[in-house]
Amino acid sequence: MLLVLPAEVRAQLTAEQKAKLPPAVDHEVSFAKEIYPLLEQSCTKCHGKGKSKGGFSLETREKLLAGGDTGKSVVVGDSAGSYLVELVSGVDPDNVMPQKGSKFTPEQVGLVRAWIDQGLKGEEGVNFAKAPVLNLKPNRPKLPGPEGGHPIDRLLKPYFAKHNVDTGKVVSDRIFARRVYLDTIGLLPPVEELEAFVADTDAEKRRKLVRRLLAERKSYAEHWLAFWNDILRNDYAGTGYIDGGRKQITGWLYGSLFNNKPYDKFVYELVNPTEHSQGFTKGIVWRGVVNASQKPQMQAAQHISQIFMGVNLKCASCHDSFINDWSLADAYALASVYADKPLEMVECDKPTGKISDVRFIHPELGKIDPKADKATRIRQLAEAVTSPNNGRLSRTIVNRLWARFLGRGLVEPVDEMENESWNTDLLDLLASDLADNGHDLKFTMEQIMTSRAYQLPAVNGSEQAEKEFVFRGPLVRRMSAEQFVDAIATLTGNWKNSPAKKIKFDGANLEKKKDTDVPEANWIWSNADAAKNANPGSAYFRKSFELPGKPKTADVIVSADNTFVLLVNHRNGMAGNNWKELKFRNLADRFKAGRNVVTVMATNSGEDASPAGLWLGIRFQFEDGSTKDVISDKTWKVNTEDIKGWNKPEYDDSKWATASELGGLDVAPWRLAKELKVNGSDLAFGGKFRESLQNKTALTTALGRPNREQVTTQRPSVATTLQALALTNGEVLARIIKDGAAALANGEEKQERLAKRLFHLALGRGPTEAEAGMLDGLAGGENAKESVEDILWAVAMLPEFQLIY
C-alpha cells in the first residue's frame, strides 16, 4: 500500500468533516506494537527507508513534524487538525490515502489520532529509517579460545552449546568418502580407492582425500561446470544461440575452473568481459517486443547484482521494489554502465522522461564516471565489484558454497544477502579467509569439508522445521541430475561418446597436461603431395600393434578428407563424412590384450583432384593408470586397391607401402587445432564425456536441470511427481540402463560377482546378508542381459543410491 501526500495546495477540514472523523482510541497507544506495523505496511514504500515522495518522510519524528511539499502534516495534540489524519480517514473522497491498496479502517484511524493527541511518542531504536546495509564491509571475526583446532568448529562450539546440539559423532569413513567424492568431483568413489581410504590409519586421511580430489582438475571442472552454467545462464543450445542473440562462455568457464582461476579475477572477467566471456553480460536478445526490464543491459544489471552481490533487482527493473529498498533509479543506474547511450527510465512500460544516472548499486565501493566511454565505465564497474572493500562479493560466494555442501545457506535465501546470517561470525570468517588466500575457491571448499560441522551425520529436512533455524548438521541432499546420470554411467562403464553437438570450447586456455592433451598424430595419405592435390578415390590403411592388457578406455579421435570408415579387429568402430568435424569415441570394448589391428578406409570424394588426408589418434588407459598412444604416422601401411579381406586382422599387409606423412594436425589446408578446442575433442582423452557436457534430456529436466534462460542459483531439493515418473517409467533412463546392461552382460564377469560389485560401487559398502540374497536372486536369470538390467534397476532406485547422506 502506498501513502503519497499530494503536491497541490490543501484545504482544511470543515467542522462538519471533523465531526465525521473516527474517534481516537481511549487507551495509551504503543508505537512499537500498534503504530509502527500500521505505517510500515502502508506508508514506508514512499515515505520511509530513504524515500520521500512529495518531500514527506516519516523516518524520524523530526522529519514527520517537518512535513512535506504542501506544508506540515501533523499538529501534535490536535489530530483533528492534522493533514495526515485527513488523508487516511477518507472523509474527503477526493483526497484519500493510500491511493493504492487497502484503506485505513476506522479503528486504525483512531490509533493514529490517539498517537498524535498523546504527543507523537516513539520508542528508542524503532523508526522507519533505511536499515544499515548488512554483509557489505569486510570483517575478520575474533576466534574464541582455546587456540588450535579447526576455525569453523571453534566458532560453532558456543553456537552448538547454546542450542543444545549434540556433535559427539561424525559420519563413518565410507559415508564421508562418498559425500566428498560427490561434492568435489561429482562421481562415485571407485571401490578400490574407497577400501584403501577406509583401511588407511593416517589421522589426516580425510583432509588428504579432500585435497587430492580437489586437485583432480578435469573431474573438478566437469562437475562444477553444471553449477556455474546454472548461475551464469550458459548452455549449449536454446533461445538465442541460432540467431546470434546469445553467446556461449563454455570454453572460458571450463578453463577457469580447470585452472582454478582466482574468484576475484573470475568475476572481473565476467563483468569486464574478454572475447570468450562476453556471453554473460551480452545476455539474451529476445525476439520481438520485450519489456524494458528484459533488455540486455538490464539483464546485465540484474545478474551482476544477484550473482555476485546477492541483491534482487528484478522488481526494481520495472518499478520501485515492494520487497526491498531498491528503486527503479538504482536498477537503471547500473544498467546504464552497459548502455551505448543514456537510458530513459521506463516504469511499468511507461517512459518517465527521466534520464538515468550511472553508478554501482553501492557507490561507496567505487565511482563510475558517467561521462566516460562504455569500455571505461565497464572497467570501473568491474573494479568496484572486485574491490577489496567489497566484503559482499566473498560473502555471497562462500554462502553459496556452504549451501551447496550443507544443504542450506548461512544466509537464506542465498540471493538475499542483505538478510542476517544465522552465524555472522562464521560467514565473516569464510569470506575473509577466502579473500586472504588469493580468492582460491578450493581453499574455501577444503576449509568447509574438513570441518567437523561438514562431517556431522546428515539431518532430514523435516527435522529442520523449527520456527527459528538451528544448524544441526548437513541436510540430506538429492544427487543432482548430472550426478545421477554420471553415477549410472560409472556403474555400467557406458559413457557418452561425445559432448553436446554445439558445445564450444574456444577460450579454454587449458594448461597442457596429459589429461587434456591429445596424441600428436600426423595427417597421412598414400602420396606425399596429398595435402595439395590427390586423385579422387579411396586409400586403405592398416595398423597392427600390441597392448599389454585390455584397456580401461580407448579414446579415438579421427578426421579424414573427405570420409572414413574405421574398424577395430574387424568390428564396427566409427565413421565420418566431414573432415571439419573431428569424430571421437571410446572404443575400449573393441580392443583386447595382445595384438590388435585398426583399419581405415578413407575416401577423397569428388570428380577432380583435391587435398586428401587421414588424421587419427588413440589414447589407451589401463587399470594401473598407465597410458599408451597410437597415432597416424609413417608406420601405417597403405594401399589404393580394395582387396578382398584387407580389413581382417589376419590379412598379410607385408607388401603394402608405408604411408606418407603430410604434417601435424594444424597443417594446411585443414588447420584443425582450433576446431579441436572449439568442439572439445581434446577432452575425450580422459575416458568419458560427462552429463555436464550434454544437452538436457527429459530425464535431467525432470531431475532438476533448469532452463538456463534464467539465473538459477539453487535447484529444488524436494522430490516431485515428474521425477518419480522419469525414474520409474521414463524412456531416457530405461534406455541408459538397457544399454549399460548390454555392455556389462558382454563381459566375462560372473553375474553374482558383478551384482555385488555394482552394489558396492553404488552405495560405498558391501551388501548385507539379506541384500546379498536379493542380488543372487536377480543374478540367477537365464538371460544375462535381462538379469543385469534388473540388478541395475534395483540398485538405481534405492534412496541410499540417489541421496547424499
Describe every region a protein language model picked out.
Residues 26, 45, 51-56, 70, ...:
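Axial heme c-ligation environment in periplasmic c-type cytochrome domains
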Residues 509-531, 597-682:
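An acidic-aromatic loop/edge-strand motif
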